[in-house]
Amino acid sequence: MSEVEYNQENTHYAEVDNFDRDAMSQTRARSRSPVAGGAPSSDRRDRDRTDRTDRTDRSDRPRSFNDRAIASQHAATQASRKSQKNCRVYVGNLSYGVKWNTLKDFMREAVDVLLGDTRDGSITRARNASAARWLNESRRQCGWIADGKVLRFCPGWVTGGILQHLNHVRVAIQHSTRFPSFHRQPSIVYTAGHVVFSEVLTLPNGSSKGCGIVEYSTPEEAQKAIREMTNKQLEGRQVFVREDREDEVRYGTSPGGPPRGGGRGGLGGSSGRGSFGPPVRGGFYGGPPPPPYGGFGGGAPTQLFIGNLPFDVSWQDLKDLFRSAGNITRADINMGHDGRSKGSGIVAYADSNDASNAIAMYHGYEFRGRMLEVRLDKFASAPPMDPYGRAGYGPPPRGGRGGFGGAYGGRGGYGGRGGYGSGYGDPYGGGYSHEAYGGAYGGGYGGGYGDRHGAAGGYSTRASGPTSARAPAPPAAPSQQIFVKNLPWSTSNEDLVELFQTTGKVDEAEIVIGGGRSKGCGVVQFATVEDAETAIAKFNNYVYGGRPLDIEFNRRWTKFGTGGGSVNGGNDGNAPMVEVSAQDDEDGDAPVPMQG
């Protein structure tokens, strides 16, 4: 067996863009690949050990969280200076656990080893020297042979044969301990291209927006990514890819600052001060107590809260640990504003039986020296329901408007009219505002947005007592404006523009403001009615920031510049605005929104 000789004269090394995040991260602790110093070599025996001196000393690498953040921001700044709009693509509908490196690997979708037809004497290519050394070592152990020739791997670009005219190729290879001789030309799979930078967009509190930006080395590669990567699965979600429509790049950390939101309301009581009183005053006795494992949307619960986790546990570790209990659809680690773990996480199963098994198996389980707390997640996002569906802990009988299920009477509390009580639309409860009066989407969480005879989101009215249910309002006439409800409290005007410009041209977008804080809803105006219809069809019930959005055409035309239509912000043409005075706020009679 003759070994393929490496012809240095016929070798052309691939250019590495100097603002590729992979190249710039060599001085960061995240990097794992050594820097190749001198002439490339495919064998450890031929490697000059003096090349190690060119590497950055490990002691000089940033180790603290702040140092790594500064290094990451510096890399983003350098990439922004050389970024080209026609090379960038926007990737939407990402899972909230996707990080920039996962996104980059997905959009690149190429393995480190690129194999060509060796019958004409061409040499296979590895992405870097480290991969080449590993492959050559594996080749010696496994005896990778093709047509009587021993495969030899080298870094850089090799001319000759089928590899001469391709930039990024890969071959589907069966996993085996020994490759048989090739009797036919290997099948070549083209990838989208070379990714030079990727970033997942985040909210001010550090959580993912579910979208990101990826930049390729050439416009042709970006267009190829749009054609080939759209509707592909990434961590259980079909992503969509389009060109980036922003003239200015958005690389770098999102602007910080505390998320907007109000204080916590009480646990019931007729004046919202919190009470465990009789049914007429709300509180926990406003309705029947919640069952031990009550769910949302009337279905069995599937999402678990995992507490007392070690702070170094990643979402991959969490998913691997709980995988034995059943099919996991999502696993997340709760992160603080500083990017560090809070020591807790969320695991969602596809089946409620699997969730019950996980509680039985892992509650009290010792993991890395800690006893885990495993229970049902009480704050799991509820799926959209029909206008009269019960989505709380149980049916809402007539009782306190606070508490876990009252219909009317008290104020505030953990639900009642909206929240954990009547769910998404009981006639006597809250929900999506199909009731006579009361704060929609949760009395306990400060009302939410848009009630019938109450404040247009955020506050509940003082009236209490039985009343007849109003019929659901007819759908609004199509227009260029849409009304978006159940937004995260930290959502800004710019976030609205970024979210909805994926479906069409956005002329204006504003968050509804009341009392100096967000009401959890907003108005978006498109250039055409068709764009507005597309946005409703695409983003209604879309989970954004952990909340399912409720979108419809705006019933009353909003003039922008007044806090997102604070005068016209009510989403029902028959709902008058109810102003909450400062005195009411001081007395505690008017519950204020709480950050969800």
Swiss-Prot record:
Domain RRM positions: 182-246, 302-379, 480-556
A Pfam cross-reference name: RRM_1
Record field: transmembrane: none
Biased composition annotated in UniProt, kind: Polar residues: 1-11
SUPFAM superfamilies associated with the record: RNA-binding domain, RBD (SSF54928)
Signal peptide: none
Job of this protein: Binds to intron-containing transcripts and is involved in quality control for the export of spliced mRNAs from the nucleus. Binds to pre-mRNAs until splicing is completed or until faulty mRNAs are degraded.
Protein name: Serine/arginine (SR)-type shuttling mRNA binding protein
Organism: Mycosarcoma maydis (Corn smut fungus)
Organismal lineage: Eukaryota, Fungi, Dikarya, Basidiomycota, Ustilaginomycotina
